[in-house]
């Protein structure tokens, strides 16, 4: 096992512990608490993959951080903070929408890279809006926290979430997963729109109906689907 992988996990465990203390003292806001919960799931997945105990890793991580801080000068810390780009946390969903439990009548689950897509295939002929909470850096989506699909009545019918065991994803991973989710929902004659916030930072462009532009891969898949449907209709006639 790579030593850098282990030490990175140990430091992440300790930093999560520090952030948990901030929340326990009621010093964290809603986005801070949201990230804490998501990172907890990620650490559990990484710990299982690496076969490392989180409590023991936290203690070692503390020693690593203390050693670094002891060697770090105030001037170097100021320079690091000044040169680091700042990310922003954007929310389409409320805390209630983000944390609400939901179930599927006809569940379908697919893994697309480091992201998990869940769709309720029982949903038909609905107007659906995709909302997401995510971080942005350089005016581009950086990290997806959670994306959910809502009907006009407020029911959750789909979801995209990072896999705890595979931390890290790109904007292309997110766009591909959204394409899969939209395709699955539209297959049952649902009309799907994407929130303006997500359109802006994931695509920087969109159709007037709120649907993001299709990638070449999605266009080819849609063309095959249409041809297949036309053939079935002709056979039925």
From Swiss-Prot:
<keyword id="KW-0899">Viral immunoevasion</keyword>
<dbReference type="InterPro" id="IPR004208">
    <property type="entry name" value="NS1"/>
</dbReference>
<feature type="region of interest" description="CPSF4-binding">
    <location>
        <begin position="180"/>
        <end position="215"/>
    </location>
</feature>
<comment type="subunit">
    <text>Homodimer. Interacts with host TRIM25 (via coiled coil); this interaction specifically inhibits TRIM25 multimerization and TRIM25-mediated RIGI CARD ubiquitination. Interacts with human EIF2AK2/PKR, CPSF4, IVNS1ABP and PABPN1.</text>
</comment>
<feature type="short sequence motif" description="Nuclear export signal">
    <location>
        <begin position="137"/>
        <end position="146"/>
    </location>
</feature>
<keyword id="KW-1262">Eukaryotic host gene expression shutoff by virus</keyword>
<keyword id="KW-1102">Inhibition of host PKR by virus</keyword>
<keyword id="KW-1088">Inhibition of host RIG-I by virus</keyword>
<feature type="compositionally biased region" description="Basic residues">
    <location>
        <begin position="217"/>
        <end position="237"/>
    </location>
</feature>
<dbReference type="Pfam" id="PF00600">
    <property type="entry name" value="Flu_NS1"/>
</dbReference>
<keyword id="KW-1113">Inhibition of host RLR pathway by virus</keyword>
<dbReference type="GO" id="GO:0030430">
    <property type="term" value="C:host cell cytoplasm"/>
</dbReference>
<keyword id="KW-1114">Inhibition of host interferon signaling pathway by virus</keyword>
<dbReference type="InterPro" id="IPR038064">
    <property type="entry name" value="NS1A_effect_dom-like_sf"/>
</dbReference>
<dbReference type="GO" id="GO:0039502">
    <property type="term" value="P:symbiont-mediated suppression of host type I interferon-mediated signaling pathway"/>
</dbReference>
<keyword id="KW-1048">Host nucleus</keyword>
<feature type="region of interest" description="RNA-binding and homodimerization">
    <location>
        <begin position="1"/>
        <end position="73"/>
    </location>
</feature>
<keyword id="KW-0945">Host-virus interaction</keyword>
<keyword id="KW-0832">Ubl conjugation</keyword>
<dbReference type="InterPro" id="IPR009068">
    <property type="entry name" value="uS15_NS1_RNA-bd_sf"/>
</dbReference>
<keyword id="KW-1190">Host gene expression shutoff by virus</keyword>
<feature type="region of interest" description="PABPN1-binding">
    <location>
        <begin position="223"/>
        <end position="230"/>
    </location>
</feature>
<keyword id="KW-0922">Interferon antiviral system evasion</keyword>
<dbReference type="GO" id="GO:0039540">
    <property type="term" value="P:symbiont-mediated suppression of host cytoplasmic pattern recognition receptor signaling pathway via inhibition of RIG-I activity"/>
</dbReference>
<feature type="short sequence motif" description="Nuclear localization signal">
    <location>
        <begin position="34"/>
        <end position="38"/>
    </location>
</feature>
<comment type="function">
    <text>Inhibits post-transcriptional processing of cellular pre-mRNA, by binding and inhibiting two cellular proteins that are required for the 3'-end processing of cellular pre-mRNAs: the 30 kDa cleavage and polyadenylation specificity factor/CPSF4 and the poly(A)-binding protein 2/PABPN1. In turn, unprocessed 3' end pre-mRNAs accumulate in the host nucleus and are no longer exported to the cytoplasm. Cellular protein synthesis is thereby shut off very early after virus infection.</text>
</comment>
<keyword id="KW-0694">RNA-binding</keyword>
<keyword id="KW-1103">Inhibition of host pre-mRNA processing by virus</keyword>
<keyword id="KW-1090">Inhibition of host innate immune response by virus</keyword>
<dbReference type="GO" id="GO:0030291">
    <property type="term" value="F:protein serine/threonine kinase inhibitor activity"/>
</dbReference>
<dbReference type="GO" id="GO:0039657">
    <property type="term" value="P:symbiont-mediated suppression of host gene expression"/>
</dbReference>
<dbReference type="GO" id="GO:0003723">
    <property type="term" value="F:RNA binding"/>
</dbReference>
<keyword id="KW-1192">Host mRNA suppression by virus</keyword>
<dbReference type="GO" id="GO:0039580">
    <property type="term" value="P:symbiont-mediated suppression of host PKR/eIFalpha signaling"/>
</dbReference>
<protein>
    <recommendedName>
        <fullName>Non-structural protein 1</fullName>
    </recommendedName>
</protein>
<feature type="region of interest" description="Disordered">
    <location>
        <begin position="205"/>
        <end position="237"/>
    </location>
</feature>
<comment type="similarity">
    <text>Belongs to the influenza A viruses NS1 family.</text>
</comment>
<keyword id="KW-1035">Host cytoplasm</keyword>
<dbReference type="GO" id="GO:0042025">
    <property type="term" value="C:host cell nucleus"/>
</dbReference>
<dbReference type="InterPro" id="IPR000256">
    <property type="entry name" value="NS1A"/>
</dbReference>
<dbReference type="GO" id="GO:0039524">
    <property type="term" value="P:symbiont-mediated suppression of host mRNA processing"/>
</dbReference>
């Amino acid at each position: 096992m790579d030593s850098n992988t282990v030490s990175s996990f140990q430091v992440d465990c300790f930093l999560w512990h520090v952030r948990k203390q901030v929340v326990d003292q009621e010093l964290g806001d809603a986005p801070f608490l949201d990230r804490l919960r998501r990172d907890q799931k990620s650490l559990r997945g990484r710990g299982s993959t690496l076969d490392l105990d989180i409590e023991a890793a936290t203690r070692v991580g503390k020693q690593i951080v203390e050693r670094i801080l002891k060697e770090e000068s105030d001037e170097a810390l100021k320079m690091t903070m000044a040169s680091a780009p700042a990310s922003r946390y954007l929310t389409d969903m409320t805390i209630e929408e983000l944390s609400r439990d939901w179930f599927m009548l006809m569940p379908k689950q697919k893994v697309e890279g480091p992201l998990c897509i869940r769709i309720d295939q029982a949903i038909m002929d609905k107007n659906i809006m995709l909302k997401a909470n995510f971080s942005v850096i350089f005016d581009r989506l950086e990290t997806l926290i959670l994306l959910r699909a809502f009907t006009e009545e407020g029911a959750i019918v789909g979801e995209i979430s990072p896999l705890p065991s595979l931390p890290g994803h790109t904007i292309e991973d997110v766009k591909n997963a959204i394409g899969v989710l939209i395709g699955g929902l539209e297959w049952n004659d649902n009309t799907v729109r994407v929130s303006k916030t997500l359109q802006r930072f994931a695509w920087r462009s969109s159709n007037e109906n709120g649907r993001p532009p299709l990638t070449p891969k999605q266009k080819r898949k849609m063309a095959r689907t249409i041809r297949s449907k036309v053939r079935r209709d002709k056979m039925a006639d």
